[in-house]
């Protein structure tokens, strides 16, 4: 389901951020980020891990996913939280949407209590894979810092470097 938009999203998550020449000068976002990003764009082993993860993303699953589950798709209304922009929805791996959400909690420097709240309130299936969850969390952190889909993050270069290292550690578990 929704194969074309999933392929488009795949390119923006798993391919474009790791091209050395992708049309985005990261120094225009954060001075020094372009050169620092090369360690990820030139890491052959990391790119192999990312390719396998991308294939997992493209595989069919049994969970209906939003497909772009980040704060820009969450609206707080008087009736509670509403989720918008379902155009990337598809049946896939539950770990994907949860990983995207957790990545954005990292990117916005949420306190540990928020992560505990998610852990304690998300009902995981018996087949839920925590390593896959970590990998999807890591790839989203990487793509939002060194990819084309930039966000208005109030993070200095040292903070971005720290998050990038965390992302790689999540991916390479």
What are these regions (language model features)?
Residues 1-53, 146:
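Active-site catalytic-loop/activation-segment of kinase and kinase-like phosphoryl-transfer enzymes
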Residues 48-96:
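Active-site acidic catalytic loop and adjacent metal/ATP-binding pocket
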Residues 77-80, 124-129:
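Short glycine/proline-enriched coil/turn segments at helix->beta-strand junctions
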Residues 82, 99-101, 162:
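Glycine-rich, phosphate-binding/catalytic loops in enzymes
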């Amino acid at each position: 389901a929704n194969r074309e938009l999933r392929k488009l999203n795949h390119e923006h998550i798993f391919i474009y951020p790791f091209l050395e020449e992708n049309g985005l000068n990261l120094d225009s976002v954060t001075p020094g980020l372009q050169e620092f990003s090369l360690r990820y764009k030139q890491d052959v082993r990391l790119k192999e891990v990312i390719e396998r993860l991308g294939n997992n993303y493209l595989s069919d699953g049994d969970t209906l996913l939003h497909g772009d589950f980040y704060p820009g798709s969450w609206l707080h209304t008087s009736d509670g939280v509403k989720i918008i922009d379902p155009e990337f929805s598809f049946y896939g791996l539950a770990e994907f949407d949860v990983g995207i959400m957790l990545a954005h909690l990292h990117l916005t420097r949420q306190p540990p209590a928020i992560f505990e709240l998610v852990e304690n309130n998300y009902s995981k299936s018996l087949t839920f894979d925590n390593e896959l969850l970590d990998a999807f969390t890591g790839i989203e952190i990487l793509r939002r810092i060194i990819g084309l889909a930039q966000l208005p993050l109030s993070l200095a270069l040292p903070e971005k470097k720290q998050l990038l290292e965390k992302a790689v550690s999540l991916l390479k578990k």
